[in-house]
Each structure stands twice: as C-alpha cells, then as structure tokens.
C-alpha cells in the first residue's frame, strides 16, 4: 500500500516537517492544498460531486478540481497535476488568492486558481461521481442558503471569489 506524504507547514506556510496524510488529518496539522475553478465560455462553473469512495466530504459538490500538495511539490506544480488527474485536461491556470488554514478548511493553506475550458472532460471515477456546469447566480443562491450538498470549503472559496 502506498503511503501519501504531505508537507507540514507553520502559520506562515513554511515547511517544518513531513507526515503521512492520515496523521496530518488526525492531528489537525497545517498543510497545503489547491482548488481550481474551471469556467466555460458562458461563464458557468464546473462543479464536481466528490466520489462516495472519498474519506472526506463524500457525495458533496466541490470546486472543479482540488487536491493536496504532495511533499516535495509546490502549489504551482500541484494545480496542473490535479486538473489533469481529475478532469483529464490541461489549461492556463491563473492564481486568484490563498486562504489561511482554519478548522473549517481542514487546516489547509489553500491556493485557489481559475481557468477557462469548455471540455470535454474525463472525470476520474476514483475521485468524482459526477460533474456539471452551474450558473454563477445559482451557485450564489445555494451558497447563501447554506446548501448542505456543497462542501464547506467550496462555500468559503466561492464567497471569497464573489466577494459575498
């Protein structure tokens, strides 16, 4: 069995250790992740429904693609890797903002990117059960209503992105 190692970081996002992913989550240690917002030419956002095989937030709607920054990797190398692994595409990624770790964010520093792509996509079945395009106004409404079908991380990212 392959053990996934992640970098543990301090409050300034400096690497201080490396630990197995399971330990990082169990001990609530700070670590790094990326989230990518994929928009089409109609300004709709691609959402992914997380696989029921996932250990966290299974079956909930989330950003277009996301993942942990592996030990030895940077945000800049992780984002295109995750986009390709989860959706089977490449695109020019634009960095938007970085969120600081909180309990609601799983103690992750999250670098958020955006890109434009109209598909087609090849969703990774181990990661994603479904993908769909959604109008930004519909997302605004669902996020404002605290829709339980969306991950808390996605709602936090969306509010920041939209200035809500």
Task: Please identify what each model-predicted range represents.
Residues 35-65:
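A glycine-rich, hydrophobic loop/mini-helix early in the fold
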Residues 6, 44-45, 131-132:
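A residue-level structural signature of the nucleotidyltransferase/glycosyltransferase Rossmann-like core
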Residues 19-22, 59, 71, 97-100, ...:
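Nudix hydrolase/Nudix homology domain
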Residues 46-47, 64-96:
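The catalytic Nudix box helix
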Residues 15-18, 43-49, 120-124:
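Short, well-ordered strand-loop elements centered on a beta-strand within folded domains, enriched
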Residues 4, 32-34, 65, 109, ...:
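Residues that flank catalytic or metal-binding motifs in active/ligand-binding sites
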Residues 1-35, 41:
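Acidic, metal-coordinating catalytic segment for phosphate/diphosphate chemistry
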